[in-house]
């Protein structure tokens, strides 16, 4: 059965993802290292991992597989999930695939190097609003439908 995993620390689309999971009657797992209230929705579970670098990422990567969907902005986690057979959607609605994750990781690494070399370099830092939420919902619907055919 398809499960929706959310890298929940600082995820801006938890409520939108919950609406989709509820409509499709599929389980959703919020994974974080604290700070979230247990959900009232019986389809949504909360996994609190120990404090530490990448603990939530490690848990998600260990539990997701073919037919599952992961929502994250973390590109190394996305890469691990894709290799495990899961599908990945970013909160802005971008769908990550085995074909586009390599260039995305390379760009991420390049930007880290630029920021390290130039402390005054400013990132794009765009806002997150209705358009991004709408794009996320469209992408999540499409990816969840495909995942259900697999799972």
Curated annotation (Swiss-Prot):
It holds the Pfam family DUF188. HAMAP family: UPF0178. Belongs to the UPF0178 family. PANTHER family: UPF0178 PROTEIN YAII. NCBIfam families: PRK00124.1. This is UPF0178 protein Pden_1915. The lineage of its organism: Bacteria, Pseudomonadati, Pseudomonadota, Alphaproteobacteria, Rhodobacterales.
